[in-house]
Amino acid sequence: MTVKKLENSSDVNVVTEEVKILTNLLNESTEQLIGKELFTKIQNLIKISADKNYQELEDQIASLDNREMIVVARYFATLPLLINISEDVELASKVNVLNNTNQDYLGKLNDTIDIVAQKKNAKEILEKVNVVPVLTAHPTQVQRKTVLELTDKIHKLLRNYREVKNGIITRVEWTEELRACIEILMQTDIIRSHKLKVSNEITNVLTYYPKSLIPAITKFTARYKELAKKHGLDIPDATPITMGMWIGGDRDGNPYVTADTLKLSATLQGQVIFEYYIKQINQLYRSISLSTSYMKPSTEVMHLSELSNDDSPFRTNEPYRRAFYYIESRLVRSEQKLLNITNQHSFLKERDLEHLDQIPAYEDAQEFKADLEVIKRSLEENRDQAVVKSYFTEILEAIDVFGFHLATIDMRQDSSVNEACVAELLKSAEICDHYSELSEKEKVSLLLNELNNDPRNLHTNNKPKSELLQKELKIYKTARDLKDRLGEDLIKQHIISHTESVSDMLEQAIMLKEYDLLDNQSARVQVVPLFETVEDLNNARDIIKEYLNLDIVKKWLVSQHNYQEVMLGYSDSNKDGGYLASCWNLYKAQKDLTAIGEELGIKITYMHGRGGTVGRGGGPSYEAITAQPFNSINDRIRMTEQGEIIQNKYGNKDAAYYNLEMLVSATVDRIASKQIVSEEYIADFRSSMDKIVTESNEIYKKLVFENPNFLDYFLQATPIKEISNLNIGSRPASRKKLSDFSSLRAIPWVFSWSQSRVMFPGWYGVGSAFKHFIDADKKNLQELQHMYQGWPFFHALLSNADMVLSKSNMEIAKQYAELCQDEKTKSVFDIIYQEWKLTKQIILQIEGHDDLLSDAPNLKNSLASRMPYFNILNYIQLEMIKRDREDEIKGVFQSIIPITINGVASGLRNSG
């Protein structure tokens, strides 16, 4: 049976029709706004770009003045955005059609559960699976919230296109609505005029919950349980998807994340879910108008209705409505009490608002659920099964998934900050005056003694404290208070960036101990190491083994159901060692850590710190998960979802449902599937990969760390400086100076290479390493081909590199190299170009393909259709960078470069 692969797939014919309509409307709106003369220039640029006459394209763009340039840039930044919307709509439509007609596609939940149901431990697998997308605000989402709201409207209109074609919806009215959206879009500021605050990032991300995530997750969870039940597998407590959040708790390198932002994040999350519940209960109140004249409610329902203040004479015979009114009142009171806010709700009568403090708040979400279960049981006793299924299924699932907290907030801090704080605490408590000078063994011994034997909170003495320590302590106090109010699931882990030792983990424990988030018996918050660099990944095995063997850690793990989470950093390991070294060392680290967990009877679970690009661990979701080492996914997996990827995956409920289905199906597949190839076969592959990766790492380091011109090339031949000035995130682009490579954040590093169309982090060093391996023995090419065909990890490795190469453009990259100030710096491009050609050649040779993207024809067609448009954006960007670096651009024209960055990011889709 051939299974359709839908990621990066859409109905080409329908998309072509829609794009033609969108392009015509954009053209008409643009010509109307700017006049025929300038619009003719735009059309001429498209023709030149389609003909690949790049020199003439460069000349024509150089002839435009700044006033013309801003309009032209807006036009070409808008078109890829519209194409994206059309493709997203058609993908969702295709999924719905295939589901409704019982056809198969890769990752379809029905098929996955059908396969798993044959396993002896099927119930255990399906009951325990938990996939957690963790939303972050890393600076790659360059679109404003206002623009996203406009694109949502266009998305909704395009969803109706088939009805328009069939005459169900009037074409003229539909077209005019679409035209109005495009006219507004063309005259709306695409780029923010001010840098985002953390509070803005929180509110922006939370908008995805009511419009897509909550409805998609509740629908998916209900469907998941229903499909399992068809196989006789009753899993009422399963939560295949829960959500995570970094914004407000991730303070690593972001001085603007404080105790206040943590509290704000928790409060706003609570508001979102309470508003959802209140809206749903209000809908139940309005809909379930059953009268005692025709049915007999349970005694429990009558009790709830009697507690209600709804004394309307029209409700006398409607106990369900009165019960819902009471539940709704309790929810409003709970929101006020638990979140410390006062919200007015129009459904409550003014008299009830005055006496709201007399209504008991729910202690937790399960108490709220219990009231709904009372009503559900009563309806079932009256055989109102359709009412129960239609009105109760999804809200009850929502309570189990979201509670009163919505999403689990991760806390994160750099290990160096923890060390500084612990050193200060130990000194102020007169325990140790020179902690940082101790050896690793001495540090561990001292910290264990404190954790095991010293019940004190070290900060409680009256000695003055540094600003840093005060800030950190306040965050831990806030975390404890929030957990006490909103439940244990609100904050469950604290991640340590740059974990290099056991003492780094124990220092984190000391900080948690200061506000009783752990003690010598149990832990309310888990210490989670983040291994980022290649060196740290190689050391992870020894660090984790020593840590897990500590007696106090064993006690903590008992309180956490014997799970230990480890976070793996894709971005920094790539920047540190290159694409192959990063992927391979992450793979090996997982195998090693999983083996340690099995040896000690502890489930090691992984948090994957992925970004949108291949250079940051991105790529198609299904393949990314099924390419993980066998046995590395026990039942829980978490992964970051960053920047523009959040909009792409979760921008609407159809896309959200499909992408969540891919994540869960892939996870279940990886847990349930047997080893495709033997361990001995993989052992041979591992030996070969070790050799290849060593070579690749040397090639990468020779250029990045040993070539004296490389850093200057990066700073001059990419828009890194311009990206650093963008108002696209609260976090600085670099921890120190931009010219300090070690402190440069991985995200702007990758984003800059994407903009210059080199896509360097996703492929550099691959070609030479493989060629060296092939040249060493003529049989090695055949081995690589076998690896590609039979090893999911290696297949995904090459497929992702293939995709990255297809999005690169060396002709454009060469023009960015011309920005370099001297020939020595410019010569770095020649090294990059030679490696690019070799990598493309070798990858195609191993894959057995003639062209890139041979296995992804839909993506290939998509890129081909948009390339002529967003290639022009690169040339506009280049010209404006030249002008700005020669004589700083001022005023409204400062927005031109950011507009082009926005457009290129939209065109590439996974750019940061």
From Swiss-Prot:
It catalyses: oxaloacetate + phosphate = phosphoenolpyruvate + hydrogencarbonate. Forms oxaloacetate, a four-carbon dicarboxylic acid source for the tricarboxylic acid cycle. This is Phosphoenolpyruvate carboxylase. One of its GO terms (cellular component) is cytosol. Its cofactor is Mg(2+). GO terms for molecular function: magnesium ion binding; phosphoenolpyruvate carboxylase activity. GO terms for biological process: carbon fixation; oxaloacetate metabolic process; tricarboxylic acid cycle. The lineage of its organism: Bacteria, Bacillati, Bacillota, Bacilli, Lactobacillales. Its EC number is 4.1.1.31. Keywords: Carbon dioxide fixation, Lyase, Magnesium. PANTHER family: PHOSPHOENOLPYRUVATE CARBOXYLASE (PTHR30523:SF6). NCBIfam families: PRK00009.1. Belongs to the PEPCase type 1 family. The active site is at H138, K575. InterPro entries: PEP_COase, PEP_COase_bac/pln-type, PEP_COase_Lys_AS, PEPCASE_His_AS, Pyrv/PenolPyrv_kinase-like_dom. The keyword Coiled coil does not apply.
